[in-house]
Each structure stands twice: as structure tokens, then as C-alpha cells.
Amino acid sequence: MKKKIGLLVMAYGTPYKEEDIERYYTHIRRGRKPSPEMLEDLTERYRAIGGISPLATITLEQAKKLEKRLNEVQDEVEYHMYLGLKHIEPFIEDAVKEMHNDGIQDAIALVLAPHYSTFSVKSYVGRAQEEAEKLGNLTIHGIDSWYKEPKFIQYWVDAVKGIYSGMSDAEREKAVLIVSAHSLPEKIIAMGDPYPDQLNETADYIARGAEVANYAVGWQSAGNTPDPWIGPDVQDLTRELNEKYGYTSFVYAPVGFVAEHLEVLYDNDFECKVVTDEIGAKYYRPEMPNASDAFIDCLTDVVVKKKESVM
């Protein structure tokens, strides 16, 4: 009989329906309810992208396809997928409990975020491992980052090339690529968090692969807290690049995200587009990886490499 291996796929989570927004936001705020104004603001953002984010559906599809692919590409072990979310059910701890109940003793934990940070990957994997230790007889092997994975870089190289190939030579000369990820509080830099460096590296790899000379790194979707967050914000960066260099076409690659969701559909497709419209520039944003075969192949390689290194 083949050994069963747990595949713990972890992600941020998103409200499933409008009624979930308040409890979801309260969980993000560590139990503090949002003010009516804050709740209204977030609800309006969801309404602007069609009422609710497609993220829940995409995350589940990514996880199921990954499980299927892993069981197709090898015959030594049988992967069983469990989904664990940070801010809404099924919570990470629930997924680990279910895994334990199913008699799983070894699991590979993959966070659907390519870059490592203490705020994201470390906290997800930490929660999973803590729960596994409490339950006993279950080892969780966490994957730190996978932004250097050749198929991940290639996905974005192809996506960016696809946009540039549709431009005339004249437009291409005045175009700039903005590579971005979710901003985090600036204090992580003082703590030696590798997150900003990893995004810079990712941008270099993609620009080199897509043969794009004009590119910059930006940050987006900063939280509403008194702490300073890493910048420049993509909207400010857009204005600055237009003023300084006269760019008139902006290509946004939000590579810190793996799916279409609020941060991309609103913060990029709405907020950044407001800026490009204002300055009379063109707005482009490649398709997100979502559950595309190319992206699932990339994640398959990531999991297989981890499994081979620890088992």
C-alpha cells in the first residue's frame, strides 16, 4: 500500500458571501470589530468587483488540481489535500486536526504566496506546526518560498511578453513594467525579513526573461494602521514614473499574489487604472496564474522537491 502524505495548502482566505465580511475583518483585526465606516468601505470594495471575491473558488480549484497532478506525476506516495485558511474557515488548525484524524503522519505545507515573510509564510507554517505538535504523531514540513522556481518566473515572463508583443515599437519605448506584492509594515526590514529582497529579485528575473528594460518595484494594498508600511505604493509610483520619465503605458504584474481577488481586481484594476486614466496613460495587467496548468505544474515541482529533500 502506498504511503499517504498530507498536502496542506494554506492561503489567506476571503469572505464567501457579503454577510461574512464583518467576522472576516474582525478576525484579521485580532478580534476587534471594525467601525461601521471601515466595514462599509470594505463592503463597497467587494461590491465594486462584483459583490464578492472569486478567490475562494480559485484557491479550492488550485488545491484540488495540485493534489490531482501530484498523484499523476509519481506513483510512490498518495497525496491527500487539506485546505487551511488564515482568516476564515476551514482554519489552518481545523485542516491539521482533520489530517491527524485521517492518520496522516507526514505532510508538506505549501502557502499560496511565493515569497517568504515572517508575517505570512512563517505565521501560517507556525500555526500548522503548533497544532500538529499538540496532537502528536504528525510532522509538517513547511516550504519557505518558491519565487525562484523556474516555472513561476516563466509564467510571468510569458504573461508580460504577451502584453508587450501587442504594443507598437513606439508604445513599447514609453512603457514600464511595475512588479508588485502586498506591502507589509516597514518594521520587518529592521528584523532582517527577506521579503523585500525576494520581490526585487523576482522583478529582476522577470524583466530579464521578458527582455524589458524599463521596470520598477512597487508595493500595494497597505493596511490601515498607524505604522509605516513598505513603499513606494503602486499608485504613487505610477505618477512618479510618468512625471520623471514620461512613461505612457503601465504594465502591472502583481507577482506576490497567485489569483484574481480583491487586491488585484480593486487595488490594481480599479485604483491603479484611476491613476493611469488621470495621467492619460494606458493600463495593462496580465492574467493571474489562478488554476492554469502552467501554474499547477510549477507548484507540483515545488512540492515534489520539498518531499524529496525531507523524506
UniProtKB/Swiss-Prot annotation:
GO cellular component, as recorded: cytoplasm
CDD domains tied to this protein: Ferrochelatase_C (cd00419), Ferrochelatase_N (cd03411)
Top-level taxon in the UniProt lineage: Bacteria
One of the GO BP terms on file: heme biosynthetic process
Catalytic activity, EC: 4.99.1.9
Pathway membership: Porphyrin-containing compound metabolism; protoheme biosynthesis
Gene3D superfamilies registered for this protein in UniProt: 3.40.50.1400
GO molecular function: ferrochelatase activity; metal ion binding
TM regions (residue ranges): none
Annotated positions binding Fe(2+): 182, 263
Subcellular localization, as worded in the UniProt entry: Cytoplasm
SUPFAM superfamilies listed in its UniProt record: Chelatase (SSF53800)
Binding residues for Fe-coproporphyrin III: 12, 29, 45-46, 53, 124
Pfam families assigned to the protein according to its UniProt record, in alphabetical order: Ferrochelatase (PF00762)
InterPro entries for the chain: Ferrochelatase, Ferrochelatase_AS, Ferrochelatase_C, Ferrochelatase_N
Keyword terms of this UniProt record: Cytoplasm, Heme biosynthesis, Iron, Lyase, Metal-binding, Porphyrin biosynthesis
Catalytic reaction(s) noted: Fe-coproporphyrin III + 2 H(+) = coproporphyrin III + Fe(2+)
NCBIfam families, A to Z: hemH, PRK12435.1
Function: Involved in coproporphyrin-dependent heme b biosynthesis. Catalyzes the insertion of ferrous iron into coproporphyrin III to form Fe-coproporphyrin III.
Family: Belongs to the ferrochelatase family.
HAMAP family from the UniProt entry: Ferrochelatase
Protein name: Coproporphyrin III ferrochelatase 1
Species of provenance: Bacillus thuringiensis subsp. konkukian (strain 97-27)
